[in-house]
Amino acid sequence: MPIPPARLLKYCLASMAVLAAAGPDIALAQAPDSVISQPGTAPASTFRTDRLTGEDVKPSDGVGVFDRMGAKLPDLPPEKDYKGPIDEAYGAYQRGYYLTAMDKALPRAQLGDPAAQTLIGEILSQGLGVKKDVKNAAFWYGKAAEGGDAAAMFKYALMLMEGEGVPRDKVKADDYMRKAAEAGNPSAEFNWAQILVADNPGEKGLKLALPFYEKSAEQGIADSQYAVAQLYATLKDLPEEKKRLAREWMARAARAGFDTAQLDLGIWLVNGVGGPKDYVKGFEWLKLAANGGNVAAQNKLAHLYVNAIGTAPNPVEAAKWYVLSRRAGLADPALEDFYLGIEDDQQKAAIEAANKFRRR
């Protein structure tokens, strides 16, 4: 489900910087020969990738979830079936009979049934079996939102934020997003948490947002699971039982396919953040993220191959992942020195492997 509140984008980096200062430093333990630093928000050309000493290690740069604003969330858990007279229309909608669903829902929508109004809004907003009509979709979402339908309040809030089919209205959008979040809509909970962080700088906003991130995370939103993991790891004054769950929440987000969570989980496992070190599993998660196209993970994976952390040393694989990350703009002087020091045939093999690479 898309989350396009562009109003929040300008707050992203500032909010991330706030989080970095929200809690005590997390000392990242060094691996025997190397340490993987936490991903940051700096441009690729300044991404720190050379070896670090214990004094160089810095805390996490914060909830990278803010980089995801405007991106697509993972699929939500199945919605509960509508109850009452709209069931038949919703059943037709689920089977792909959109015109039938429209015909059956419209009379109920005209009589003020919020569930039917939401269904009409969904059909019109996506152009399912009918011509896409954002303006009329906004009308029906608005009616359903007035009637208290949580899904409609969320959709209508997004439209108000973007001025899509309805004039922009920040105050009204925030109000409906809050109401949808309080009603338990998981995507609204995530968005309302984002708004709270943006509108309340510092630790105050993070603590206000945390309960909504937690509720959304419990319902399967990977972005929220990632946020919970980072906040549990960095916020001060949280109960120890929550801090102990930070890695588990990161793992949930990683298992849901969130590549940034896969990257961070790999780093946490290698560095022993939130639990014992596990070089093999850390390697596996970084490789998964790297195969998915995450450039920072490709860079870190190259370091693991160079230093034989969680895997056997493999100069060709190390060079391949370095070539891929360098092509994406992530400079790394240490890996460049390594690359220039291997044999010509190894360089050639690495380039050929990089050329054949396809994201999985």
Locate each region found by the language model.
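C-terminal segment of classical bacterial N-terminal signal peptides
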Residues: L19-A27
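N-terminal leader/linker segments that initiate helical-solenoid repeat arrays
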Residues: A27-K104, Q110-L111, A115-T118
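Terminal, low-structured helical/coil segments at or just beyond the last alpha-helical repeat
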Residues: S60-P74, L324-R360
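Short helix-capping/linker turns of helical repeat alpha-solenoids
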Residues: P78-D81, G96-Y97, Q110-P114, Q126-L128, ...
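Hydrophobic face of amphipathic alpha-helices that form TPR/SEL1-like repeat modules
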Residues: P85-A92, L119-Q126, A157-E162, N191-A198, ...
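TPR/TPR-like alpha-solenoid signature
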Residues: I86, T118, F139, F154, ...
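Structural signature of tandem alpha-helical TPR/SEL1-like repeats
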Residues: R95-T100, K131-W140, P167-Y176, P201-F212, ...
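Alpha-solenoid helical repeat scaffolds
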Residues: D103-L106, G142, R178, E214, ...
